[in-house]
Amino acid sequence: AQSYNETRAQVPFGFYIIMAAQFFSALADNALLIAAIYALREMQAPTEYEPLLKTFFTLSYVLLAAFVGAFADSMPKWRVMFISNAIKIAGCSMMFFGAHPLVAYAVVGLGAAAYSPAKYGILTEYLPHRLLVVANGWIEGLTVGAIILGVVIGGTLIRPDISQTLLAFDFPLIDTGVDTIGEMALSIIGVFYIIASLFNLYVPDTGVDHKQLKSNPFYLIHEFNHCLSLLWRDKLGQISLAVTTLFWGAGATLQFIVIKWSEVALNLDLSKASMLQGVVAVGVAMGAVAAAKFITLRKSVRVIPLGIAMGLIVLVMNFVHEIWLAVPLLILIGGLSGFFVVPM
């Protein structure tokens, strides 16, 4: 059997370009989430609007599930990812120019929904089967890490001391039009999207022939339902779909609960509460790497008890009121989540 280091050495360089593009795109998505929460609070919107941001973001994933796969397969994957990032930049720009954060973040979600099948599909085109577990470890680890780091960066950008320092920078003879904390944060987040788009341009061609697929929406819906039923009838497919659906659903909910919990239990403001989530990134990275190293596809279901343990530790967080105790527990939760979700 090949060692993990030998397998990693066989991964072509283009794979890391794909990972870099994915990292910066996901990083910007989640930094934008904090900027959107800040924008809602600045406009004194009802507090229940904040979790609705995630609902509006993921709406496209549900409504367009039957169509985004066909779109991703209709052209080279790098072009799909580039177009998707352009849509995200449009959503970020809408928020900058005063559109309601819920509407603007929904546009970003449209880009993310189109991006998702391309980022996974290109791996199967570009890498041999034996490298897919390692590749999935990278993509899940970097994605979750980008989620956490993006929230930290978003929280940092809205800190009064940091934001005022950044606003003090200016270009001679040029009026940038960036005058508020929100505009400054959105400008920097837009740069992250541009970096991701530049990486997309250097994603290697996989050599796969992209033929125009059927575009009839009724056919695509029928085909989607057929594939979905096949997955649910497969024993391992059932486990993978059920577990990952619950995992990401709970994770999206916890993203907002942790912020509110930090404000109530630890007396932290939005900036510090969002940065507290960053400590989870350490555990996520360790867990994802460990899963890629030790867990094969045949052994993937063996990680399910770790998901149960993770849930129990999340329950324990109800009784934590000190930051020195919260930090190691959040790192542990991150480690378990990274080790748990990669094989699934």
Mark where each language-model region is.
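Transmembrane alpha-helix termini and helix-breaking/packing motifs in multi-pass membrane transporters
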Residues: 34-44, 93-97, 149-189, 264-266, ...
